[in-house]
Design a protein with these regions (language model features):
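A conserved mid-protein helix/loop that constitutes part of the nucleotide-sugar donor-binding site
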Residues: 2-16, 28-32
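Nucleotide-activated donor-binding/catalytic signature segment of Leloir-type glycosyltransferases, i.e.
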Residues: 30-49
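Short glycine/serine-rich donor-binding loops of glycosyltransferases
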Residues: 13, 71-74, 92
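A charged, aromatic-enriched C-terminal amphipathic alpha-helix characteristic of glycosyltransferases
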Residues: 119-148
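Short alpha-helical donor nucleotide-sugar binding micro-motif in glycosyltransferases
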Residues: 53-58, 142
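Short hydrophobic beta-strand element within catalytic cores of glycosyltransferases
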Residues: 83-86, 97
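Aromatic "clamp/platform" in nucleotide-sugar-dependent glycosyltransferases that forms part
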Residues: 66
């Protein structure tokens, strides 16, 4: 990921939580944040296979962004069985399917509360929600819209 202002990573770093905080990625705020938060494990930019191992080893993936239009990293984490904690804003609302009870993670205006609650989300549920975004599911959705369009012309 990108360690930059718009990712709101400070919200994650300032949370008091059990365990070790891990940050993957590089960016303009990286050096300043490294010196301010020395207890955080900074892994830099990782190859996809290593990143998948980091996702799978995490108890919760914290997505502190408030301005993402989608947030593919949430799906990547959930595909590895890691529940997501996020603010209830556009990207996470769609990815976690807020209209059906936020499957695969927890949305909350208090990010620490989202984190705490996400610890209780079963890992299989996170993975199952990620599979809703597979190419096979995308194809089904596309076909569902094609048929009504053909019959109305």
């Amino acid at each position: 990921g990108r360690v930059s202002y718009e990712k709101n990573i400070k919200a994650f770093l300032e949370m008091e939580t059990p365990g070790t905080k891990v940050v993957c990625g590089v960016g303009p705020l990286e050096e300043a944040l490294k010196s301010r938060y020395p207890g955080v494990r900074w892994l830099g930019l990782l190859p996809r296979d290593e990143l998948a191992l980091v996702y799978a080893a995490a108890d919760v993936f914290v997505f502190p962004g408030r301005s993402e239009t989608f947030g593919l990293v949430m799906l990547e984490a959930m595909a590895c069985g890691t529940p997501v904690a996020a603010y209830p804003v556009d990207g996470p609302l769609e990815v976690l399917n807020a209209s059906e009870g936020a499957k695969g993670g927890v949305l909350h205006a208090d990010l620490k509360q989202a984190f705490t609650d996400a610890l209780q989300v079963p890992r299989w549920q996170a993975r199952e929600r990620a599979m809703d975004f597979s190419w096979a599911e995308a194809g089904k959705l596309f076909q569902a819209y094609l048929v009504p369009a053909r019959s109305s012309s």
